[in-house]
């Protein structure tokens, strides 16, 4: 029971940042959707880019603290796991237990979050983002915001929204797995 305060801290850390991330996502989305129609087209590009970058920053912060919370949970409940991870037979023995299966699922879920974020942000978004040089001139920015490019910008925002929702769902799953892991 001496490990209980650390375990509680790990769980609270994850819950806090899930709630924080959800709130930030809702706030950014609501602010963007209600305000973007009142902004002149040349400035919409800057605002879209600013909202996008802030949402991505919040996403990576959330992932960082999800990793910290997961590592803290694993350290508290399986303190010898890191030293045993170098020995394949001992690691297999740990992963064959119910707690080991939950730990493996938690690691897989966290890695999926990282891969999903990396794929969206490093592969998909660069193809849909507004070129920086186009932002420097209002006339070029206005020309860039044709119907085709508006569709691309909206597709990027939609992708970030789906990514954010996926992070919220996966983050909640990781928290549930952490609770199960600590109670088995």
Regions found by a protein language model. Name each.
Residues 1-184:
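Polytopic transmembrane helical bundles with strong interfacial aromatic enrichment
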């Amino acid at each position: 029971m001496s490990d209980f305060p650390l375990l509680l801290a790990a769980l609270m850390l994850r819950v806090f940042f899930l709630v924080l991330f959800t709130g930030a996502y809702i706030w950014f989305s609501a602010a963007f959707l209600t305000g973007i129609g009142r902004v002149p087209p040349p400035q919409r590009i800057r605002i879209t880019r600013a909202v996008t970058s802030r949402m991505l920053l919040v996403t990576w912060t959330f992932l960082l603290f999800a990793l910290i919370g997961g590592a803290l949970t694993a350290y508290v409940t399986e303190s010898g796991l890191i030293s045993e991870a170098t020995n394949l037979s001992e690691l297999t023995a740990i992963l064959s237990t119910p707690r080991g299966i939950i730990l493996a699922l938690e690691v897989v879920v966290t890695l999926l979050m990282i891969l999903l974020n990396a794929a969206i942000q490093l592969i998909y978004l660069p193809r849909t983002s507004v070129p920086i040089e186009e932002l420097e001139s209002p006339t070029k920015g206005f020309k860039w915001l044709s119907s085709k490019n508006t569709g691309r910008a909206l597709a990027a925002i939609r992708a970030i929204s789906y990514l954010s929702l996926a992070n919220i769902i996966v983050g909640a799953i990781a928290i549930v797995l952490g609770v199960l892991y600590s109670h088995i």
